[in-house]
A protein has these predicted regions:
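Domain-level recognition of soluble alpha/beta enzyme cores
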Residues: 139-165, 171-175
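Active-site-proximal alpha-helix that buttresses catalytic centers in soluble enzyme cores
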Residues: 6, 17-103, 141-142
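Non-DNA-binding regulatory cores of transcription-related proteins
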Residues: 112-113, 125-148, 163
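Short, low-complexity, intrinsically disordered N-terminal peptides in bacterial proteins
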Residues: 1-21, 112-115, 175-176
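Generic beta-sheet signal
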Residues: 23, 65, 110-123
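Histidine-centered catalytic micro-motifs
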Residues: 25-31, 121-128
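Short, surface-exposed amphipathic charged segments that create phosphate/polyanion-binding patches used
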Residues: 102-108, 160
């Protein structure tokens, strides 16, 4: 089931091509309860969650996926489970805001001239949940994304209209 939110896009000419951006929000897997916060590591269960979700992502996500992770150790470990190149962006740290996250990925256009872009963000609550709420409901709200889960959004501009669609929500306990 897909959920869609439509709104008017910035003025575009008839010659402007249709574009699409996929955004996957992946909350880091289960981590130790310790301090300092940036140094918290994944638990054994978290490592398993990260590996399972990484396999699902590799099977289902677009192939041109750009991966960006928070500098927190638990997010770095979650990203490494993919065994793919990724970058680190301090704007995605535990205290990130929704505007920080959206700026880091250049939502809804991506930082490319290609017609189709896909970005995977590995980050934290409450930022990921608040971002999901904004994309689907039009305003930030306190939505929760479960540890290790992925929420996949597609944003496209078609005939001058922007549409955001929720393509999938995948919690780690649903993958065996």
């Amino acid at each position: 089931m897909e959920i869609s939110m439509k709104h008017a896009a910035p003025k575009m000419t008839d010659s402007t091509p249709d574009t699409r951006m996929d955004l996957l929000l992946w909350r880091h897997a289960e981590a130790e309860d310790s301090t300092p916060d940036l140094k918290r590591k994944l638990t054994a269960r978290g490592e398993k969650q990260a590996r399972q979700m990484a396999e699902w992502i590799k099977q289902h996500a677009p192939k041109n996926l750009r991966i960006i992770a928070s500098p927190a150790v638990r997010c770095q470990q979650t990203a490494k489970a993919l065994d793919l190149p990724f970058s680190t962006d301090k704007r995605l740290g535990p205290d990130a805001s929704v505007p920080d996250l959206l700026a880091a990925i250049d939502w809804p256009h991506g930082s490319t001239k290609e017609r189709s872009v896909a970005v995977l963000v590995i980050g934290h609550q409450p930022t990921l949940g608040r971002t999901a709420a904004l994309l689907l409901a039009g305003e930030e709200a306190s939505w929760t994304i479960k540890k290790g889960a992925v929420w996949w959004f597609s944003n496209r501009v078609r005939q001058g209209e922007t549409q955001t669609v929720l393509r999938a929500v995948m919690p780690p306990d649903s993958i065996r």
